[in-house]
Amino acid sequence: MIEIVHSLPTPHDAVRAAADGAGRLIPPLWPLASSVAVNPFLGHTGEPLWAAGARLGRASGAAVTMPRSWYRDRIAAGSITDEDLLDALADAPADLRPADLGALRGAAALDPEPVRPLPTVASLCAEASGIDWPGLIADRLGAWAAGHFDEGQALWAAPSGGSTLALWRAWAIHDLTPEIAGLGGFARHVSEVPDGALPALARAVCGLGLSPGALESYFHQILLSLGGWAQYARYKLWQAELAGGTDGTLRDLLAVRVIWDEALLTRYGERIAESWAAVAAAHASPARPTRDLVIDSILQDAAERAAQRALAATLAATLAGGSPGVGESRPALQAAFCIDVRSEVFRRALESLDPGIRTLGFAGFFGLATAHRRFASDIAERRLPVLLNPGLRTCAGGPALSDADHASRLAARARRAWGRFRQAAVSSFAFVEAAGPLYAAKLLGDSLHLGGPATPHDPMPRLDPPRDLASRVATADAVLRAMSLTSTFAPIVLLVGHGANVVNNPHASALHCGACGGYSGEVNARLLAQLLNDADVRAGLRERGLEVPADTVFLAGLHDTTTDEVTLYAGDLPGGSPLQGLEPVRVWLAQAGKLARAERALRLPRARDNASVVRRSRDWAETRPEWGLAGCNAFIAAPRHRTAGQPLHGRAFLHDYDWQRDEGFGVLELIVTAPVVVASWISLQYYGSTVAPELFGSGNKLLHNVVGGIGVLEGNGGPLRAGLPRQSVHDGEHHAHEPLRLSVLIEAPRQAITDVLERHREVRALFDNRWLHLFALDQDGRMAWRYAGDLRWTSTAASDGAVPGLPLRAAV
């Protein structure tokens, strides 16, 4: 029997504050059906990299930068120069940085001691007993959580109808594994836990002898040890708060794990008392950055400055080449793509085919934040940035397709019933014997890459319920102005969303559009095309001073980023008659796809030619069908002619923006607070999965097992893994992603940018604490000003000391 020795009770308010504070340090994990890139440092953006490194190192032992050898190689190769090192050194905290360049170079030549996390109660008990308590806890919690959080994968649903803590207690009192392993009386201990997470946590931390000052650090370490389970609970809280509510799952899950420590300390307390007292005292002290952490952060900053120099040279080459600005002549074709870095390669290829082709970059949800129901489905897919709530409700099809809708629903039910029959406990054995040979053809086809999913072609989406004309006109006006597309319209304007068609890939949705919430972007593109082709909407736009020529047609498309093929939704056009001039557009798109595939093949392992790139999307054994957004390191908001024709190698998010058309700088504010933040999440997810793969990566794709439709395990057990697989950032020999924090370049008056930062403290924190770098471009498109933090700017060398740059303030 376990007896609890209570110390002085800890007030519930202190426990609540510490639990909530620790929970905010955990990034959310979206389920696999709509997985989006998440900044793993989301809770640390209020502190610089070295401070986050101190906190994470103490809790998990994770690094926040690359090994020193990675920087040494770049210094030796000359890509990181002495100037980069000196500039980074000058920006580091004076009390911990090396004295001069020589001292920094000397420090870079030495490898620091590995970061060791504080021991946990479970790890101390494992040392004392020889029993792998951390592994056993992860196994038992995972076994329960897989059923509790299941989103439809399991054949039998776990019990529901209570809090997460209550449901775990009901399960745990019948689980004899801990007692068999040596934790006698565990079931009784669980049965005596107070109802509610706060009372349970308060009792447990008293038993653990933790002071109020130690709680947040201890809770943070516990939540990190839960891996993706804690992150999924954080997602539930995120979604609840976005809807104006709250959710207690994360706090309950924390209580579940702390109850284990409470029981273990009671069982092994005498043997680990001294060690645990030292750990508890360490949790109560601040996590202070070490000199090595600051040195590593300086080296990281220097690597980023080297990349910024290269980018500045690329932009200067555009200027030196005399690249013309956008003229007044009418283009033959305009094509708006998502700002996704994969679009940059295709856009450059398309523009190279004809001087009359112009492309634009805009967030891939095209300004339409919609909750969409696909054909014959009642599931509302949130096709919008996860920072936002849907403002529209849409569906595919309409009353005229009710018979087809009914037939599709019946077919879907039959498929689900057949699938459950195949997987059921009893029938699965007979199924393999009786029906297994019927799958020989499918097995052969999949092995020969003959099958695979097709691009979805749902019926044309529509607003449900419809919006009044004034609302539709206002939406169309806002979107066109945000795209800086207000004049010189081409006869055909493509609105191209993007998605990826791959097979046998649990993380397939991560290759879709991040701005569309992890879904492909054709729905939003088709909706906007309908809106802009509406004659009544165009008349309303005319009254607002925005004239769209009568012969201009907006046509939606979908860019498959795996094959670089573009599907056009010409069937959505009003009237049903063939569109004049469409055939040359199809030819251009096919040629651009061929050029883009040839460029991408140079980076893809074993990609020999165009055909092999396409074949990868149907290969069920291919762990790298495409590189996704690996390599991303810049975000540029400027007119397209600043970057046109320059090889950015699929590393830059490109958002069209003309500040002189942005009266009041509302579009600038939208860009800085939405697309820039989404891009930062993507960039920092790739960064975290590269520098700290054990903490922020999902491991080896070859070992993945999908759990509950939520995430993956690496192997047959252990914690839920979040983040990117190793194959998404590494080619087997070298890193495919260079972990650099994003450099944001904006062509706008500095004061306008400063005003936006001043109004949005959370966004400003990203730049003040160097999770993002910020530059203002001058009137020639050069990187003339660097944001120095605290709403200050410093001149850079990019303008050779002679160019005054854009005005501090816009002319009135």
Curated annotation (Swiss-Prot):
Pfam families reported in the protein's UniProt record: DabA
The coenzyme or cofactor needed here is: Zn(2+)
InterPro entries per record:
DabA (IPR018752)
Keywords, ordered alphabetically? Cell inner membrane, Cell membrane, Membrane, Metal-binding, Transport, Zinc
A Gene Ontology molecular function term for this protein is: zinc ion binding
Binding locations of Zn(2+): C338, D340, H498, C513
Q: Pull one GO CC term from this UniProt entry.
A: plasma membrane
Where is the signal peptide, in residue numbers?
Answer: none
In the bilayer, the protein is annotated as:
Peripheral membrane protein
Domain of life of the native organism = Bacteria
Q: What subcellular locations does the record give? A: Cell inner membrane
Q: Does the keyword Transcription apply?
A: no
Q: Function, please?
A: Part of an energy-coupled inorganic carbon pump.
- Family classification: Belongs to the inorganic carbon transporter (TC 9.A.2) DabA family.
The record's HAMAP family line, in alphabetical order, gives: DabA (MF_01871)
Q: Describe, as the record does, how this protein assembles with itself and its partners.
A: Forms a complex with DabB.
According to UniProt, the name of this protein is: Probable inorganic carbon transporter subunit DabA
